[in-house]
């Protein structure tokens, strides 16, 4: 047939009236519709040689409308249904038959249906059914795209005796009649059962070959199932891949694309005996499928009819006419249920109600995408037919509803999709409402518009759908193996041309549909291919029929975005036919592989374009790569820069190391483990980079917090002190918190008791000391005694390293509050005590260095910190001042003993003697210690009357300080004399500024004159030469005059250098000459002598500059010493007229102007350099003012 089909209903007592009745009654070959006239023609077919005549009659399964909605194109809605346009299709070669006999056949079928208890056995011999071609055009016709349209029954019943199950169906009818009031809510569940029920039409041998039509009906509900119990289950057409909420594998196959096998009588009897049980189970499931969801199978296209039913299932509900028809047919179905008509399409109750119509879908509805799939059954049905007998009769083409009802007890249902079926299908196939109008016919093709065949919607969901299909097919396979009744299989010989088996072959034909349709979306085809790949070999053994010759070219359709080679179907196996029909003249009748060669391998990179689904969206284009090609296209995103990677690696390495080491420092670990972990951490900290990481991550405090109990263990305390010492080497560890500082001070308190040493194994202690010694050798250890490594020594060195001038006020405060200053003062006292006892030079040097380091700490914490100054003055009754005074006296004695001034006189070529090395070593330690002592005393007496008084009370301290100004510098190298002299003068100024007692003591003191005063007097005036003891004031005035004269002399020399600066010499390279009234420059010839002379002059200029700098330095030193001496004399004159008179006596002409001029220069210099605080400048200004009024 070439028209779209109307609907014929078989009624009680008469034939249905429809468009087909009009055609058959008028004996016309045209059918008038709104779209024109459709011409169809039936032709005779040929006998098929392999046909087996003895096929048993199979009970025909009628369909009864029992639900609330009837068929959309029932006799009540025939006039209202939209007519179908006829297409100019290729004519089908059919068996011609008389239309009168067709009408008679229809009546006969109706009577058979009403009888309901008879099974007519028809032996069909040499019945030839020609293949039908399925054009593409009428697949989706706009709003008329209704997949529920059903073909006239009489077209297929004309020459067939319908086989009807009779004996045991009345019980089922009664049960179903009771349950016919159930409303099936899950509309989409109809799509869960992709199997298309087919009724088998047996062709009568006496009549001509019938017109090639076939009945295929989609079960409206679970009650409408094939009457053969044990039929083959299949999961091939699991369209739920495309409908997200549909999951079912209850596809029941009772037939194959091969010819029907002979059904054995005993098998058929067994199926009839189990019918009641299946019917009872099926009634329970009948409420799960609504009536308005149908899929109809087309006729006699063995490759496509099964696919048509399933494809129609996809198209179901897409047209508006269908909705209208469903609403009308729902009334019909309800009336039929009330009338008690045939229930569930399985049994009839007398002649009550209307029999279920049989529908044959138009072939054009099946070839939508022009794809031919020929071996889907072979590749995908093996696992569902394992338990079926290999040689069953024609009854195997029928499927009882009871079979599915039995299997559905294990079926899991998913909630229905929230989208309407129309929306789902439109999304899947990309159809738009405005594109679904009727289209004009063409030969073998359709003109409707398809938007990308739905591929843009499938690319993202195929993976998920494949997984679901895999799981469901496995479940279906298990259920099939455990089915109680065997499935029926058709014989292989009588499939293609037998009209008796046309309805039965719909299932098998539809199974082949998806591979043969060119445009079937891959998401529909993909699960079939995967399932078929697993079962290909087994299916070939079971469904082994004669191969048919190809009817048309095959194109393996596949999704362009997922061209997986392993998922593409193999070359389809074409089964031989006695009569082949071509869709068009362009289709070759030769082997498929010869027509279309294998497609070229897909490109490695796939370009995907996502079409926007909503307005105001942009098209998204992306490049994708298949998983198997990933090795060729390695895409690395967010690549870090090289420096970032290195930094990340360093941070990760540091994190791993510190976590590992911290785990070994915990108190729960054994003592030896903790010691080794501390030494390992100290070894890491020897690298500056690791120390940097440790501080950057704030791990120093965490480490010392873990080692808080280390002072209780001698060896662990030693390791902890070594770790502190290593961390202090870069002098950047100012981030110590209070706890760490407290631990450091507690380590200072540890005493090296002999008793505690005995508690520890001496051998282990020596090992630890050796490791620490080797570790300390790798870092700066100038003041560390490697031979005497103790906890206190390491802790003290650490503390001294940390207390630089950069230490903040918080550090100074915490050190005092935690008791750190107490330990340092005690350490100073201890070192000073050793100075008087130690005769060994090495021990002497150690004591001197120890005292010097402690005093450096005290000096740094007392600068501009009155709190610490007062604390140290009061601590243990000025213990620090007493110890400092004693130490200063010892250093004065030692500096004379270890005179380093003589070493500077040694010849340059002579090697230093051994005693000179010792002298230099000890002498330097003494110098450093003296400077540290005076520095601490300066801070304690600065603007502090209490400190000045306490310091001045110390015996011999003022005399010692005066000697440091006048006598000590001669025992020091030239470069060290200025420093010690200025420090002594500063100490004397602080002592006499706020203390009248100290002023009185200094004025009444006698001392020797300055060591260099005699030298200066020898060069100058003899009146300045003084010998023996003199008053301190006289010695200080003499020093002032000498330094002031030296400064003037240096200044005059500097002025001479400036005056004698080379002037611009006359250019001797030429001369100006006047010739003929013009002045011209005439150059002279250069000689080598002039060039050498020029170089010599440049060298002389450099020497003069260096001399000028040296004179300026000497001048500055002399000016500062003279200024400090003048300030000291001015302080002595304050509030003491006697002292003013004394000083005036020693000044030239008794004039203080020379002193005030020097102080004014010094004040201006101090203001420029901001070297001292405002307090010193105020003091200088006060003294200047006082002297000017004297």
From Swiss-Prot:
Family membership noted in the UniProt record: Belongs to the WAPL family.
Short motif FGF motif 2, span: 429-431
Region (Mediates interaction with the cohesin complex): 1-659
Posttranslational modification: Deubiquitinated by USP37; leading to stabilization.
Listed Basic and acidic residues bias regions: 54-66, 531-540
Keywords annotated in UniProt: Acetylation, Cell cycle, Cell division, Chromosome, Coiled coil, Cytoplasm, Host-virus interaction, Mitosis, Nucleus, Phosphoprotein
Transmembrane segments: none
A GO MF term: ATP-dependent protein-DNA unloader activity
Expressed in which tissues: Isoform 1 is highly expressed in uterine cervix tumor. Isoform 2 is widely expressed with a high level in skeletal muscle and heart.
Any one GO cellular component localisation term in the record: nucleus
InterPro entries: ARM-like, ARM-type_fold, WAPL, WAPL_C, WAPL_dom
Subunit structure: Interacts with the cohesin complex throughout the cell cycle; interacts with both chromatin-bound and soluble pools of the complex. Interacts with RAD21; the interaction is direct. Interacts with PDS5A; the interaction is direct, cohesin-dependent and competitive with CDCA5/SORORIN. Interacts (via FGF motifs) with PDS5B; the interaction is direct. Interacts with a SMC1 protein (SMC1A or SMC1B) and SMC3. (Microbial infection) Isoform 2 interacts with Epstein-Barr virus EBNA2.
Predominant cellular place of this UniProt entry's protein: nucleus
Chain intervals for the UniProt region annotation (Disordered): 1-23, 46-82, 459-553
Motif (FGF motif 1): 73-75
Residue ranges of the motif FGF motif 3: 453-455
Any one Pfam family match given in the protein's UniProt record, by short name: WAPL
Protein name per Swiss-Prot or TrEMBL: Wings apart-like protein homolog
Effect of residue 1116 to A: Impaired sister chromatid cohesion and resolution
Subcellular location: Nucleus; Chromosome; Cytoplasm
BP term (GO), one: negative regulation of chromatin binding
Annotated PROSITE patterns: WAPL
Top-level taxon of the source organism: Eukaryota
